[in-house]
């Protein structure tokens, strides 16, 4: 057998894998959508995910054997994309599955056969791993397959024991690795060495069930779940350095490189990373849109928007300034359409979505650049040299402005960015996002899944009752089932029935108390997991036990505020559709006790007049006292009546309809007032953009409006006292002060410019003549960067054909440099941006810009004379 595997295309590999298992009784199934049926998962992240209900015993399989090529997306380590050999957001997982049919022996035999005979991998290049306690698999590999003991590695549970959660189906797994360097021998094989080994096939043997105590018992029906990464096996068979250089991705990279006017193989590592990011992310966004995901600021729509923006940002980093994403998307579609015809069928939708998002984000980037200019001017005005991490993070988070670009522009202006502070802000955002998107604890979920067959679904009676006598069905502490818990313990409680509303549809869960004989539990939150309402709280007094009869009572005042705010969101959507645009649709919401938040899709913000009209319309509806009509209807009938549904939301066959006749009708499971008059009053407190194409309104209702107005009154009074004017005179006074400040700033800038010009005009006498060119290289004392640039432009205009290089030390340890070249100098091969960037390095800095005009900065003022001497020498050499 040859020492290297046979070369196959990615499409050939996919086909051969599926055909191999089809010939062995497996049903070939099409890839499931990237939008999973499992509500606990945002995107399809694994080949086995569509079969999870079967593995958990929740669904009877139609086939005993199946094989798929499943498209998957993972973004948990998105910053590693392009930086490692094999990390991607989009990947295909080839898999073969057995549902209570064949098991370990057959799975291993076929895994070896397809690897060595179908794909032609040399046996001497393969190493296998097994779970350290799985002697059965070890013996099969050694005695039946013939792998030498030196090439069978026993691994711990972290690497080779698969679990679906803290409880439930689980089992050992065995992995097949390819060895890129078998010449290093079999001694001291380290499978963690990714320069030598790559794991490409994982065989999971689901043979146990783990209970809450960690005990393992054999499953009656054992299952097989395998996964072979298509990109990984393609890298091996095509013998390329990484997944990105396979024929699955590299044509996309080449397209991006061509647009940028660069060559991938001769590019530096930073440029290669950007090209890889583009190649990977474009595959992701094409398939996401094909699976009917739309860019938004929530959920999977946010993931899509983030990926698109990263493509645009990395395009900028490699020199692409305009729109380009659809050119690379077309290449991705062409590569995928044979396996996934839906990408070509939905080509128009895909390209329209990408074009819209790219255009909007380019505008956002432009706004970010302008904001950065303002930040730079402010920092300089304050005599500082560092842009705060908070400012850089605002640019990154709000405008999608990459830190690298902020740093580059800052350096051109003799500034630095506080990267440590930026990382602190980034971590805060991660923690905020984690808290904002936190769902029920997976440990709780696993425990409830295990108990589901023994207890009934929670009966929710909260639409009509605020109190209920109930029985404690399940008691959990840290997600582990317990029989009892004492005072001071944080618990999760499932009752047989409850008046507590569980967080859903944007409305937060109720608060309140669960009490009994000597027992008081303060309930802080309620979440729904499957058919169970989980009450999160703390035992304030007594000992709570499973089976206890208790009284569950919600905080009535909090509920009233929440339901008033929820109805107000319905009225808000109706008013927006009526007054602003009938095509407006909800993109998200938050209904809490003290305020409401409503996100909606709109290409523009609301005018002040529109906000006032919306507010007035809602308050009119409140004053008109419209009564609610609540019905449960078949979904088709509800839609036929005109009920508004949330785009992308999944509904059952029957839906709850909240109807305020003549005003609003929506599908909704939340709690609402029985009459709009109960809301009292409504006030919009803010309207702003939260993402491209998504606006957010925050508002308050009822007594919260009075609280809001009291705070506003206090602010107005404080300002009136400070400026010594009446409240109604404040706008005029502030406008006057702003005008005075602008006038003063303009006068200051004018004086600086006049000073620089006065200093620079004297330099005309010192110009050197080199043939048809004149050059001026000089240092001006104490001139700021902007004035230095103006001086250079003026001097170049005076001398005509030539080059001007000026330097200055506007403040201690700060160097400012500028180069201005005429077109004739450019024709000699000199580019101002590259030239001044190289000169600035002498001063410990850098910079760049256009071929005819560029600025740079440095940190070592003592080296400025040397830098200018070098500039003069290079200009004379090039132009003399």
Curated annotation (Swiss-Prot):
Cofactor, how bound (note): Binds 1 zinc ion per subunit.
InterPro entries: aa-tRNA-synth_II/BPL/LPL, Ala-tRNA-lgiase_IIc, Ala-tRNA-ligase_IIc_anticod-bd, Ala-tRNA-synth_IIc_core, Ala-tRNA-synth_IIc_N, Ala-tRNA_ligase, Ala_tRNA_ligase_euk/bac, DHHA1_dom
Cofactor(s) this protein cannot do without: Zn(2+)
Keywords: Aminoacyl-tRNA synthetase, ATP-binding, Cytoplasm, Ligase, Metal-binding, Nucleotide-binding, Protein biosynthesis, RNA-binding, tRNA-binding, Zinc
Secretion signal span: none
Catalytic activity from the UniProt record: tRNA(Ala) + L-alanine + ATP = L-alanyl-tRNA(Ala) + AMP + diphosphate
Primary location class: cytoplasm
The organism's place on the tree of life at top rank: Bacteria
Residues reported to bind Zn(2+): 566, 570, 668, 672
Gene3D superfamilies: 2.40.30.130, 3.10.310.40, 3.30.54.20, 6.10.250.550, Bira Bifunctional Protein, Domain 2, Threonyl-trna Synthetase, Chain A, domain 2
GO terms for biological process, alphabetical: alanyl-tRNA aminoacylation
Cellular location(s): Cytoplasm
GO molecular function, one term: tRNA binding
Coiled-coil boundaries: none
Top EC class for this record: ligase
Enzyme Commission numbers on file: 6.1.1.7
NCBIfam families, sorted: alaS (TIGR00344)
Comment, domains: Consists of three domains; the N-terminal catalytic domain, the editing domain and the C-terminal C-Ala domain. The editing domain removes incorrectly charged amino acids, while the C-Ala domain, along with tRNA(Ala), serves as a bridge to cooperatively bring together the editing and aminoacylation centers thus stimulating deacylation of misacylated tRNAs.
Function: Catalyzes the attachment of alanine to tRNA(Ala) in a two-step reaction: alanine is first activated by ATP to form Ala-AMP and then transferred to the acceptor end of tRNA(Ala). Also edits incorrectly charged Ser-tRNA(Ala) and Gly-tRNA(Ala) via its editing domain.
Protein family: Belongs to the class-II aminoacyl-tRNA synthetase family.
Cited HAMAP family: Ala_tRNA_synth_B
Protein name: Alanine--tRNA ligase
Organism from which the protein derives: Trichormus variabilis (strain ATCC 29413 / PCC 7937)
